[in-house]
Amino acid sequence: MAVPAASDAHIRRDGDALVFAGALDRAAAAALWVQAAAQLAGVQRFVLTNVTTVDSAGLALLAELAAHARAAGAVPRVEGQPVGLADLQAAYRLTPELDFPA
């Protein structure tokens, strides 16, 4: 199995937000998981305005982070609509908050 190429994606904490940039793809999801999870406490927003594209692995990363945030009592909002996000949310029937409807 081929190893995904290094990604240009990165993440930083800014107040109550996790701010993502670059392509959220398979390589990014693997690279960013530990870093994002370590910064998740108190997050209310996922800022995607500097994300260039999202694939299914990137969506899985965001949805899992959102689930962890909800479990801690937050209701994270998503800001920005990178290429691929809306189509994948529709395909997986996710709400705008990256949750499965009840």
What are these regions (language model features)?
Residues 1-57, 63-102:
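STAS-like cytosolic regulatory interaction modules
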